[in-house]
Amino acid sequence: MIRPALELDAVGLQIGGARILRDVSMQVATGEMVGVIGPNGAGKTTLFNIISGVAVPTSGRVLLAGDDVTGRRVHQRARAGLGRTFQTSSVFPGLTVAENARLAAQSKLGGATSPWRFPRADDDAHGVAMRCLEEVGLAHHAGTAAGVLSHGDKRKLEIAMLLATEPEVVLLDEPMAGVGSGDVAGLVEVIRRLHASGRTVLMVEHHMEVLLGLVERVAVMHHGELLAIDAPKAVMADPAVQKAYLGETV
């Protein structure tokens, strides 16, 4: 039996008297791309925080390829093959595009952890960085300061940095947030290639047209619970989803 790339087993989070997540369970197959949607405050980012180790669940388990990583820290999960981008930009604006990607590569190769101390002559990390920049179409900006990139190109750089850590499971947290309309198509193509490489992808995204055109299944979060998970057409036709997510009844 093939193990899921990612499994959530009755994951819950309680802070004080508030239940933030309630018994969320799902399995994501190797190479599958799943979208995560829901109203603001539904628990989407909290779920990503628990998967990536930023937050610790009060109940349940998180498994990567069958390995229980629930108690492991962020860097340990990264070593286990998990990568993530965030809603807000995570690039170092004062470093060049290549230096940002090289720093990410060194985190995987065991190099320096400070952006101001990494060895400039690290050929292995440089090679990985340039290959990843080529994959996202930013190699021609290698010497450009990351801070002057368009928002769409910053998102591409974040994906290049993620690729440099060689993840098997990827979490994309609202990659289209703040991206201008002229940059959307290029970023969508980068995400398509990321998925086509065989990686398992979970994506939170409010741009519904983009998300529904990319994913194989959609998971719907509502009040901290997993309301539904199915193929996009089935989910969007579900009366419970329409009522909870769209505020409508049918």
Predicted region positions:
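Glycine-rich phosphate-binding loops of nucleotide-dependent enzymes
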Residues: I2-V250
